[in-house]
Amino acid sequence: MESKALLLLALSVCLQSLTVSRGGLVAADRITGGKDFRDIESKFALRTPEDTAEDTCHLIPGVTESVANCHFNHSSKTFVVIHGWTVTGMYESWVPKLVAALYKREPDSNVIVVDWLSRAQQHYPVSAGYTKLVGQDVAKFMNWMADEFNYPLGNVHLLGYSLGAHAAGIAGSLTNKKVNRITGLDPAGPNFEYAEAPSRLSPDDADFVDVLHTFTRGSPGRSIGIQKPVGHVDIYPNGGTFQPGCNIGEALRVIAERGLGDVDQLVKCSHERSVHLFIDSLLNEENPSKAYRCNSKEAFEKGLCLSCRKNRCNNMGYEINKVRAKRSSKMYLKTRSQMPYKVFHYQVKIHFSGTESNTYTNQAFEISLYGTVAESENIPFTLPEVSTNKTYSFLLYTEVDIGELLMLKLKWISDSYFSWSNWWSSPGFDIGKIRVKAGETQKKVIFCSREKMSYLQKGKSPVIFVKCHDKSLNRKSG
């Protein structure tokens, strides 16, 4: 009899040891409604506005009381933040910044951070493969919230960075009903550039998918960020290849000043810029950055795409207009090197006239814009070619809002090297009018020379043009 009691006690201890899971929770409690949630390895921390940096309370799939214990707000929208690959096995510094910005913009919302750090810390190809399992974990969690608490998935916005963007896409493809929105923050390129839609972020994964591409430098499949469009709207700030303030010269300067401690930050500077651009859109609600639809970044650099007709422009970030085109819309914009990132875009068209036929290559100019609010002086630009009796279009941007344009100055910069021909006489062109279109306001302005024609001479004083009246201003904008 005594041996039988000892056997029962041993079996009880054994069963208890088998059913206790991480954090002291009984794994059997994670089997509800016939569904087993014990295979979910990812953790779901509901962070608070008071403590955006710590995972103090976890929502545990299958454990209904965890939702009440964490004070989940069932009547508000929910943001789910999914991090990417990590070298350190720790959250990166952008995570609490994004959480804080989300709460500042939506104080009553729920901001959940998905912890898949143990899987994300592996060699990149291994971690890339784990995105499928992480996506499955997130989908099971969201389906449980919908089934158990009748929480509408239409209130859910997934935000995934790098590998996390693809995990978000996989999650969205597996939920019983579509989530409202997925934002891909520079989705990872290697292992995903040529992947089929079910294995990566795609437009089918949510009611609306918007993507920021910030580090696509390199050949397809080898660039850190994915190059091809994978959403309803894909935005490529500064062409998407590299971001201002993230150059090699800046890296060397920081290393000289601070040592090697910040090298990893500089390497991922452009990649992580996607997150900070989105944070900027949350914090600067009144001044969203505007992006413009264009067939190529080359056409955008010529200023040919600053139209807002038929949804050709859109806000970048949180306040984006949810335009679901039949095919993905590639959009471009310029930004500053630091927050606030917004700039003001202008298309400038100049016709170079003259009696002699001349062509010059790679010519440097400066233009100064003067408006009702401020001015932006000595903006440099280079034209690959300047020929007599041809019109050239190019893109300019200012970091300040100068208001309505009133006047501009144009200067042709002399070559840095000495030339006898330039010593005796420098080339020049006649310019009568300069046409400018402001992207943010869509206003067109024509500037005229004070004379019938102004002679712009290389290396000489700038030429002044003032706002003039022209019947063509009344034509419908294109």
From Swiss-Prot:
The keyword Metal-binding applies. GO terms for biological process: cellular response to fatty acid; cellular response to nutrient; cholesterol homeostasis; chylomicron remodeling; fatty acid biosynthetic process; high-density lipoprotein particle remodeling; low-density lipoprotein particle mediated signaling; phospholipid metabolic process. Glycans are attached at N73, N287, N389. Residues 1-28 form the signal peptide. Residues 420-424 are annotated as: Important for interaction with lipoprotein particles. It catalyses: a triacylglycerol + H2O = a diacylglycerol + a fatty acid + H(+); a 1,2-diacyl-sn-glycero-3-phosphocholine + H2O = a 2-acyl-sn-glycero-3-phosphocholine + a fatty acid + H(+); 1,2,3-tri-(9Z-octadecenoyl)-glycerol + H2O = di-(9Z)-octadecenoylglycerol + (9Z)-octadecenoate + H(+); 1,2-di-(9Z-octadecenoyl)-sn-glycero-3-phosphocholine + H2O = (9Z-octadecenoyl)-sn-glycero-3-phosphocholine + (9Z)-octadecenoate + H(+). Detected in milk (at protein level). The active site is at S162 (nucleophile), D186 (charge relay system), H271 (charge relay system). The modification 3'-nitrotyrosine is found at Y124, Y194, Y346. Residues 246-269 are annotated as: Essential for determining substrate specificity. Keywords: Calcium, Cell membrane, Chylomicron, Disulfide bond, Extracellular matrix, Glycoprotein, Heparin-binding, Hydrolase, Lipid degradation, Lipid metabolism, Membrane, Metal-binding, Nitration, Secreted, Signal, VLDL. It comes from the Eukaryota. InterPro entries: AB_hydrolase_fold, Lipase, Lipase_LIPH, Lipase_N, Lipo_Lipase, PLAT/LH2_dom, PLAT/LH2_dom_sf, TAG_lipase. It is a peripheral membrane protein. Disulfide bonds join C57-C70, C246-C269, C294-C313, C305-C308, C448-C468. Tyrosine nitration after lipopolysaccharide (LPS) challenge down-regulates the lipase activity. Its EC number is 3.1.1.34, 3.1.1.32. It is found in: Cell membrane; Secreted; Secreted, Extracellular space, Extracellular matrix. Residues 433-437 are annotated as: Important for heparin binding. Ca(2+) binds at A197, R200, S202, D205. CDD domains: Pancreat_lipase_like, PLAT_LPL. PANTHER family: LIPASE, LIPOPROTEIN LIPASE. Homodimer. Interacts with GPIHBP1 with 1:1 stoichiometry. Interacts with APOC2; the interaction activates LPL activity in the presence of lipids. Interaction with heparan sulfate proteoglycans is required to protect LPL against loss of activity. Associates with lipoprotein particles in blood plasma. Interacts with LMF1 and SEL1L; interaction with SEL1L is required to prevent aggregation of newly synthesized LPL in the endoplasmic reticulum (ER), and for normal export of LPL from the ER to the extracellular space. Belongs to the AB hydrolase superfamily. Lipase family. This is Lipoprotein lipase. The lineage of its organism: Eukaryota, Metazoa, Chordata, Craniata, Vertebrata.
